[in-house]
Structures are given as C-alpha cells and as structure tokens.
Amino acid sequence: MRIFGYARVSTSQQSLDIQIRALKDAGVKANRIFTDKASGSSTDREGLDLLRMKVEEGDVILVKKLDRLGRDTADMIQLIKEFDAQGVAVRFIDDGISTDGDMGQMVVTILSAVAQAERRRILERTNEGRQEAKLKGIKFGRRRTVDRNVVLTLHQKGTGATEIAHQLSIARSTVYKILEDERAS
C-alpha cells in the first residue's frame, strides 16, 4: 500500500501550503503529493491527471478536505467512483471520511445521492432563470441574420443608415457593412 496526497486551490487567495503540510504530517512523502492551482470550473488539472496515472490497486489517496478533490459534489463523486473501481481508497483528513471498507461504500452511496440531488437542483435553478429571462423578453439562441435585401431596399428609398439600423434593430455598423459590400460587388 502506497500513500499519495492531492491538494487543490481554486483561487489565488487560497494557499496550497496548508494542505501540503497536512498531507506531510499524515505521512505522505513529498514526491507523492500532487497539486493543482486552477479555477474551480477548469477541467485542466495536470496534478490530478498525473495522480490518476500513478495510483494502483491497494493505494490510498489523502486529501485535506472533501471540497479539495472535486470542483463540485458531482465531480468529487465521479472521481471517488473512478478511484474505487481501481481499488484505490480516498481518505479526507479533516472530515474523517474514508472510502475503503463497508462504511466507505456507504459513504460513497450517500455522496452519490447528494450529487444527484445537487444536479437536479442546479437544473431546476437554470430552468427557473431561463423562464424568468423569457418573461423579461430576453431572447435565447443565435441572433437572427439580417436580410440584406431589406437593408438595400430601405437605403434605395432614401432611408438613412441610422434609421435603417433602428427599424431593423441592428447596429449601424452592420448597415454600413452591407452597403459597402454592395458597392464593392
């Protein structure tokens, strides 16, 4: 059984030093500590990717806190399941949680349920926000394309670029671009 450590910070205000010190105090050798400094939403985690390649069945990964392993609950659960499938246990120092043994399997099951509930909650909030935005008149999707012929017809009738832009709800620069393209052709 080899012991590895993983530490991650998601903002510049957070420090890896405290996490690394806790991992060393727990018996992890310095060359077996993998770290990432990235935003919480970033999926580019070189340290975690290296750790995934190094661990083997029977190994243990120590992490200072639950929230340091994954970007969110769903990500953390996915990683725990991935390591569990490899026969690798994950232990969280501060939280006193370990994924090995029968109790560990129960913890993984409970955390999976929490992750599923979190995904549903996020989906509900997203849909509520989308509905509220629609009620406020905010349009979704790609902007409609400008009918060049309408712009050219209005211009031929003597309508100015500013008025065309206003009538068609487009930028004046778009009107000028269409007129310029027409002159060039």
Swiss-Prot record:
Q: Which Gene3D superfamilies match?
A: 6.10.250.10, Homeodomain-like, Resolvase, N-terminal catalytic domain
Residue ranges: DNA binding: 161-180
Q: Which GO terms describe its biological process?
A: DNA integration
Q: InterPro entries from the entry?
A: Homeodomain-like_sf, Recombinase_CS, Resolv_N, Resolvase-like_N_sf, Resolvase_HTH_dom, SSR_resolvase
Q: Name one Pfam family in it.
A: HTH_7
UniProt KW keywords: DNA integration, DNA recombination, DNA-binding, Transposable element
Q: GO molecular function terms here?
A: DNA binding; DNA strand exchange activity
- Using the record for this protein, list the coiled-coil segments as residue ranges, or answer none: none
Q: Which residues form the Resolvase/invertase-type recombinase catalytic domain?
A: 2-137
Disulfide partners: none
Please indicate if the UniProt record lists Phosphoprotein as a keyword. no
**Which residues are responsible for catalysis?**
10 (o-(5'-phospho-dna)-serine intermediate)
What's the stated role of this polypeptide? Answer: Resolvase catalyzes the resolution (a site-specific recombination) of the cointegrated replicon to yield the final transposition products.
Family of this protein? Belongs to the site-specific recombinase resolvase family.
Protein name, UniProt field: Transposon Tn3 resolvase
Query: Which organism was this protein described from?
Result: Escherichia coli
